[in-house]
From Swiss-Prot:
It comes from the Eukaryota. One of its GO terms (cellular component) is extracellular region. Glycans are attached at N20, N28, N44, N50. Its main location: secreted. Residues 1-23 form the signal peptide. It comes from Dictyostelium discoideum. This is Putative uncharacterized protein DDB_G0291626. It is found in: Secreted. Coiled coil: none annotated. Keywords: Glycoprotein, Secreted, Signal. The keyword Secreted applies.
Amino acid sequence: MTLLIILILKYLLCLENLKNISLQISKNNTINNINCENNFNNINKSYSINESNSAKNDFVKFLKFIFFHAF
C-alpha cells in the first residue's frame, strides 16, 4: 500500500514537473518570438534609414555635379 502511494506521488510530481517545463518552454518561445520581431523591426528601421541617407547622398552628389559643371 505504501509503495502504491509513493508511486502515485511520484507520478503526480512528474506531471507537475512536466507542466512546469512546458510553461517554461512556452515562455521562452514567446520571449524568442518577441526578440525576433524586435530584431526584424530594428533591421527594417536601420535599412530604411540607410536607404534614406543613400538617397540624400545621391541627390547631393547630383546637385554638386550640376553646380560644378554649370559654372
